[in-house]
């Protein structure tokens, strides 16, 4: 595969949006893949245990009103999104690139690290599929804690061996819930589903993103206070 940089410019910052294209094919000939290569640094099922228990997760699910119907509509969303992940990531990376205070977390001495951005992008695409298709079991819970540690100073930059800001501040984990939710609805509506199905997919996505962002905040909170 040949990695092609597509430049997106928004606001004051320009960053490349990295997309995969098969060698010797034109953009018109390239169709979105329905399968994803395992991203570098993606270690699902190979991480330590989360201190958050399944009982705790059940209570969190109840708090955001997440139930079996949401699981059903997340699976539907996974089918809708599986060939749109690059487009979703283009939009999200454009959003990050348009805000210097966000791209700052992927930078060293004021310069964005393009390889780092590319590696994170690949895992971000996998996260979209995981949030839709993975069962929210102990293995999933463990990996949310691993993701949390990779945002926190505990493991920030370690996965990719880069020099960049040593922590992503918790306020942006929470603040990012809205743009990641608000921008998804148009993508969910692109495959001809009824308005009701789109609303239910979007609601399930919102609940799932809220839960995962909440779980990612755990390392930032004093023991016993999360």
What are these regions (language model features)?
Residues 14-16:
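N-terminal signal peptide c-region/cleavage motif recognized by signal peptidases
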Residues 6-11:
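Sec-dependent N-terminal signal peptides
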């Amino acid at each position: 595969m040949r990695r092609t940089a597509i430049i997106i410019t928004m606001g004051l910052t320009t960053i490349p949006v990295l997309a995969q294209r098969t060698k010797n094919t034109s953009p018109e000939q390239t169709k979105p893949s329905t399968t994803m290569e395992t991203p570098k640094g993606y270690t699902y099922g190979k991480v330590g245990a989360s201190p958050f228990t399944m009982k705790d997760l059940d209570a969190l699910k109840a708090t955001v009103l997440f139930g079996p119907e949401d699981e059903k509509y997340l699976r539907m969303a996974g089918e809708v999104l599986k060939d749109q992940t690059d487009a979703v990531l283009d939009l999200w990376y454009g959003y990050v690139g348009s805000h210097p205070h966000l791209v700052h977390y992927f930078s060293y001495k004021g310069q964005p690290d393009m390889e780092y951005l590319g590696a994170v992008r690949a895992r971000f695409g996998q996260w979209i599929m995981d949030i839709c298709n993975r069962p929210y079991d102990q293995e999933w819970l463990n990996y949310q804690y691993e993701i949390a540690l990779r945002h926190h100073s505990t493991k920030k930059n370690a996965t990719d061996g880069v020099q960049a800001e040593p922590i992503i501040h918790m306020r942006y984990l929470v603040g990012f819930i809205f743009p990641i939710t608000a921008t998804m609805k148009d993508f969910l509506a692109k495959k001809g589903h009824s308005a009701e199905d789109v609303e239910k997919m979007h609601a399930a996505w919102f609940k799932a993103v809220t839960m995962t962002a909440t779980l990612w905040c755990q390392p930032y909170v004093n023991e016993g206070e999360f």
